[in-house]
């Protein structure tokens, strides 16, 4: 690992799930180059009894099991060794469907930190007391439920690592993609020029860069207005525009 490289530490019952897809393509190459590092902390050895139990029945009754606060705390303590205590420099995140929605802005903030600890839940979740005691931020990948946090953790790390300098190679790629300016990305095309009687928009073949830029901006605005009205309203509010105004999108 290169000095000062961004670090990801994952507390999980399934350390064998990593690096998974993070070990492939550009993120995998960057991992090999030492541009970032990945460490898993297996929750099971912190469990109690002969079977290293990590969970118990939910207080108040109900289905499923809950990860115990004392056991998760020991794992988080192990994961925190050598990390700064300030959460702005080293966020500690629990993947949860009730958390704040993950966003590109969040990924940018995390990429600017020294590293990140991710707690992957299982069963019915984690005892709330340990989340409160350790100032753990709850983050959601979307309005759906997974069997555990490992898949979500890989997605969040991928979104963050690709923003680290030199990982993608072409920095312009991150400036033009979806959410970089609060908009969805414009449509992309490549050869052949004609496919199944469908042609590439003529403006993209014109070589007129100003016209191409205007077309791409208009398409990005059109798609955002159609598909993500929430993003569209925020985009317009930041620019003093009426989100209901038609502007030849």
Swiss-Prot record:
<dbReference type="GO" id="GO:0052906">
    <property type="term" value="F:tRNA (guanine(37)-N1)-methyltransferase activity"/>
</dbReference>
<protein>
    <recommendedName>
        <fullName>tRNA (guanine-N(1)-)-methyltransferase</fullName>
        <ecNumber>2.1.1.228</ecNumber>
    </recommendedName>
</protein>
<keyword id="KW-0819">tRNA processing</keyword>
<feature type="binding site">
    <location>
        <begin position="141"/>
        <end position="146"/>
    </location>
    <ligand>
        <name>S-adenosyl-L-methionine</name>
    </ligand>
</feature>
<dbReference type="GO" id="GO:0002939">
    <property type="term" value="P:tRNA N1-guanine methylation"/>
</dbReference>
<dbReference type="InterPro" id="IPR029026">
    <property type="entry name" value="tRNA_m1G_MTases_N"/>
</dbReference>
<comment type="function">
    <text>Specifically methylates guanosine-37 in various tRNAs.</text>
</comment>
<keyword id="KW-0808">Transferase</keyword>
<comment type="similarity">
    <text>Belongs to the RNA methyltransferase TrmD family.</text>
</comment>
<keyword id="KW-0489">Methyltransferase</keyword>
<dbReference type="InterPro" id="IPR002649">
    <property type="entry name" value="tRNA_m1G_MeTrfase_TrmD"/>
</dbReference>
<keyword id="KW-0949">S-adenosyl-L-methionine</keyword>
<comment type="subunit">
    <text>Homodimer.</text>
</comment>
<dbReference type="GO" id="GO:0005829">
    <property type="term" value="C:cytosol"/>
</dbReference>
<dbReference type="InterPro" id="IPR029028">
    <property type="entry name" value="Alpha/beta_knot_MTases"/>
</dbReference>
<feature type="binding site">
    <location>
        <position position="121"/>
    </location>
    <ligand>
        <name>S-adenosyl-L-methionine</name>
    </ligand>
</feature>
<dbReference type="InterPro" id="IPR023148">
    <property type="entry name" value="tRNA_m1G_MeTrfase_C_sf"/>
</dbReference>
<dbReference type="InterPro" id="IPR016009">
    <property type="entry name" value="tRNA_MeTrfase_TRMD/TRM10"/>
</dbReference>
<dbReference type="Pfam" id="PF01746">
    <property type="entry name" value="tRNA_m1G_MT"/>
</dbReference>
<keyword id="KW-0963">Cytoplasm</keyword>
């Amino acid at each position: 690992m290169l000095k000062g490289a961004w670090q990801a530490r994952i507390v999980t019952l399934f350390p064998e799930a990593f690096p998974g897809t993070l070990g492939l393509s550009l993120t995998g190459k960057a991992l090999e180059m030492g541009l970032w590092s990945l460490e898993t902390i297996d929750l099971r050895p912190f469990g109690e009894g002969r079977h290293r139990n990590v969970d118990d029945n939910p207080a108040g009754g109900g289905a499923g099991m809950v990860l115990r606060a004392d056991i998760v705390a020991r794992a988080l303590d192990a994961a925190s060794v050598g990390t700064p205590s300030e959460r702005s420099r080293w966020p500690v995140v629990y993947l949860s469907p009730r958390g704040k929605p993950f966003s590109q802005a969040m990924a940018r903030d995390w990429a600017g930190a020294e590293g990140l600890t991710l707690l992957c839940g299982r069963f019915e979740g984690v005892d709330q007391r340990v989340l409160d005691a350790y100032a753990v931020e709850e983050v959601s990948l979307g309005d759906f439920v997974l069997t555990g946090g490992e898949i979500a953790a890989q997605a969040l790390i991928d979104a963050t690592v690709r923003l680290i300098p030199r990982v993608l190679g072409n920095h312009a790629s991150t400036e033009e993609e979806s959410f970089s300016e609060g908009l969805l990305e414009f449509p992309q095309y490549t050869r052949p020029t004609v496919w199944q009687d469908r042609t590439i928009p003529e403006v993209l073949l014109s070589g007129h860069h100003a016209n191409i830029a205007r077309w791409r901006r208009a398409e990005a605005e059109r798609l955002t207005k159609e598909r993500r009205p929430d993003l569209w309203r925020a985009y317009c509010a930041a620019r003093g525009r009426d989100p209901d105004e038609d502007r030849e999108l």
